[in-house]
Amino acid sequence: MGNETSAHERAAALLGEHPGYRVLRALPPLAAYPITEPQGHVRTAAVIDVETIGLDADHPIIDLAIQRIAFDARGVIVQVGQPRQWFEDPGMPIPAEITRLTGITDADVAGKRIDVDEAVSLIASTTVAIAHNAAFDAPRVERRLPTIAGHAWACSCNEVPWPELGFDGRKLGHLLMQQGMFHQGHRAAVDVWATINLLGRVLPDGETALAKLIRQAEHPSVRIEATKAPFEAKDVLKARGYRWHAEKRTWWTEIATAREAGELDWLRDACSCTQPKLTPVTWAERHRG
């Protein structure tokens, strides 16, 4: 086996040196993950992923995975815990398209339940929960585990400036490929491990993606709702990056607090919006819709 592995590595190295080829490697097993000695203050995170029976907020979870990591003042991962994963019976048939996407069948989840006490303990004892698209995971996890409501969350998809770092897109699998890795996605435990590997990689500027994520996520921001903006302003607001909140029937955005004054000036001048609603946001409130 050792000789075969060495031969494969030599072949991969040879291909990797050729401009006409790109070599992708499978994610390493947990035992092979590189760990270094911590420097400075150490904090913890729970990396989380869920699979559900659909995209609606009230669609039940069928697959939950949590894996704890510890990271130091540099944003370097210095410890990786064992993954925990649970199936849960949604009480209804899993749609065929979800089974095609995830491979999870009715038989896999029949009679299964999430260990709520263990899941809550794993999350609540950390500094922050991390998910790749936390706006999807956070409200669904808090709905299933209400005692962790108000825990800090960070989003590795949207709170890391991937395009500015030279990456094309934000999808987990695509980001991995641009780092020379691949995984079989759409299972909670696999996606969690992929997220950990993505965040732990040192980027060309010498920092990890995790360092950038934590720095961005822990800073407060402000949610601006363009209340009473005229209907005619909708295209301008959309082009600016505002999103439509169907329930509140208003356009909204979330920006760094340092940009607040300039944004209010823009709303007044470009949209005749003089009474926007401002809500301070920390990582304990963010990603809840």
State what each model feature region is.
Residues 144, 178, 198-205:
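Active-site catalytic microenvironments for nucleophilic, acid-base chemistry
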Residues 112, 189, 250:
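Residue-level "edge-of-site" marker
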Residues 118, 195, 256:
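Short Asp/Glu-rich motifs
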Residues 190-198:
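Acidic, divalent-metal-coordinating active-site segment for phosphoryl/phosphodiester hydrolysis
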Residues 2-151, 158, 165-185:
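Conserved non-catalytic scaffold segment of RNase H-like nuclease domains
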Residues 115, 192-193, 253:
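Short secondary-structure capping/turn micro-motifs that flank functional sites
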